[in-house]
A protein has these predicted regions:
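Gram-negative outer-membrane beta-barrel transporters
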Residues: 70, 79-83, 100-222, 268
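Surface-exposed extracellular loop regions of Gram-negative outer-membrane beta-barrel proteins
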Residues: 9, 13-58, 72, 79-121, ...
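Asparagine-centered polar/low-complexity signal
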Residues: 47, 128-129, 277
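Conserved C-terminal beta-signal and adjacent last beta-strands/turns
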Residues: 8, 19-20, 51-59, 151-161, ...
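Exposed loop/turn and edge beta-strand positions of beta-sandwich/beta-sheet ligand-binding modules
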Residues: 1, 44-46, 56, 71, ...
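Hydrophobic transmembrane alpha-helices and their helix-loop junctions in integral membrane proteins
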Residues: 61-64
Length: 304
């Protein structure tokens, strides 16, 4: 059985306090357990030993409405805690062709017998139970809208903090971290923030949004260091050559800005100009995946 409950309390006008608790249980999918495939240049291996994950999550928060002259909106603040047991996570590394574990010595023997080219067949991701995990955090947001003469202002801002860590991790699991000293779960950003601001004047609207994502403290170590025991022509082999240097140059995180301008031509049509990644920031949300450069879009919308 899975148990969940929640409630909301309204102690005064425009004030809402909420709390909730819920249990969760997830079986591994058929693909995670039995299917071997190749997606987007990456081998996906099955794991017949994988076990279901389960856990619970709790949240408490408050939402407060406000009005200051012609400006009104609400502020929302909440804290949360999630606990996982036998948490499932895709782990990148070398696996045997059937998805079972393969030692460095066995892998080196395969390369010696068949050449370096065969190594790609053993490299990929596999869903794996990573023991237990603890994810506390909090988030805050503000939404508001108001008028100043003929101008209409709207703002949306939010911030999220999480600190996901394993519970009593063993040394074998930590050895797969690019920075085991931090013990933060892989592929997570501790800080995320966003603000969106727009001004409307009659038929014209201009707006901007700014997003900040903190440095991803941990990824699979296989992406940042040479492959153990694999040497070609006297040089160590890397999966993503230079990625470790790329990460070290971006330890302050990424700030990405977008801008937009639109004109109401008639009551049923609108012309918009959008610029995504205004300052052409080069950034990545995971190893080997560089996100979009500056993009300019012209859009015409017509309502029938």
């Amino acid at each position: 059985p899975v148990f969940r409950f929640g409630g909301t309390y309204n102690p005064m006008e425009y004030t809402f306090i909420r709390a909730s608790y819920g249990q969760g249980y997830r079986f591994p999918s058929i693909a995670e357990k039995y299917i071997s495939t190749f997606v987007g240049g990456l081998n996906i291996f099955p794991n017949i030993q994988i076990q279901p994950e389960y856990g619970w999550s709790a949240e408490i928060g408050i939402k407060q409405g406000f009005k200051i002259k012609n400006f009104q909106g609400y502020v929302d603040v909440s804290g949360f805690l999630t606990r996982y047991a036998d948490m499932m996570e895709f782990m990148f590394g070398f696996y045997d062709l059937d998805g079972s574990d393969i030692s460095d010595a066995e892998l080196a023997a395969v390369v010696q017998a068949n050449g370096f080219g065969v190594l790609a067949n053993y490299l990929g991701a596999r869903s794996t139970n990573i023991q237990n995990a603890n994810i506390p955090g909090f988030e805050a947001s503000i939404v508001g809208q108001g008028d100043i003469g003929d101008f209409s202002l709207s703002v949306l801002a939010g911030y999220t903090f999480i600190n996901p860590t394993p519970i009593n991790p063993d040394s074998a699991y930590l050895s797969t971290f690019s920075d085991p000293d931090s013990q933060m779960l892989k592929y997570r950003n501790k800080h995320m923030a966003k603000i969106d601001f727009q001004v409307d004047y009659k038929k014209v609207a201009i707006g901007t949004s700014v997003r900040y994502t903190s440095f991803m403290e941990n990824v699979d170590k296989a992406f940042t260091e040479p492959l153990p025991g694999v040497v070609i022509n006297g040089a160590p082999v890397e999966i993503l050559p230079g990625y470790g240097t790329y990460r070290n140059a971006r330890r302050t995180g990424d700030i990405v800005c977008d801008a937009r301008l639109s004109f109401g031509i008639t009551k049923t049509s609108r012309l918009s100009f959008l610029i995504n990644n205004v300052f052409n920031r080069e950034y990545s949300n995971r190893p080997g995946n560089v996100l979009h450069p500056r993009t300019v879009i012209c859009q015409y919308a017509l309502k029938f």
